[in-house]
Amino acid sequence: MKTIFALLLGVALVTVSLAQKEKKPWTEWSEKEAQKILNDSPWSQVQKDVDTTEMFFQPTADPRTAGARAPNSNERLQQGATNQATNLNYGVRFFSARPVRQAFMRMIQLQQKKLEPEVIERMKNFAEMPASDAIIITVTVEGTDKRSLGAVMQVVESAATGTLKNTSYLERNDGKRLFLQEYVPPGRDGFGARFIFPRMVEEQPFLGPEVTDVRFVADFGKTLKLNRRFKLADMMLDGKLEY
């Protein structure tokens, strides 16, 4: 009997501990907790792409004088090569979801200690404001090689709604797709490129209780294709779907 009581007490304590942890205000998050929301959470994922084409290139060998010419060798000779695999990480996030905005604001607070009270208040309003009429996906790009990163950023920064509206969409598990409404290239705020979709379709939310998961796809052509799937059952906040 004592053993059963001890087990029940242990479960109760764990439940209370988890509840307290879940209620921790975003303004008290640590950097690690904010990064977790931004990179590995129900609302955020990181797509990792590895390019191994540079691993076997010899920068000291000029294909123009060595006989056989490898594909794109002129360009690679002029630009140089890393002789190693390059990594590109794409942060794909539901920016319209409050936890993501809160994590971004918390990171700014941690990095900039001396913020004016009115600035802090504006940040709080921005972080806690419910999403209204749009689903916003943001994408950031980070890389280990400046040349590879620069090439991708050029594509991302020069893209426009017209070139992406037929190749970027949200797809529900039932196959229904919602195509891009507006694309906004990345700016100086650090939030990344914005993919904006209407929240309502035929006077109904595109994502509702009957939907189990949603996939975000953005095809920039041969240079970049993003494809991430999110489970709606995990995207709950205070008992409601948050996106």
Residue locations for each model-derived region?
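PEST-like low-complexity, intrinsically disordered acidic/proline/serine-rich tracts
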Residues: 20-243
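Bacterial N-terminal signal peptides
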Residues: 6-15
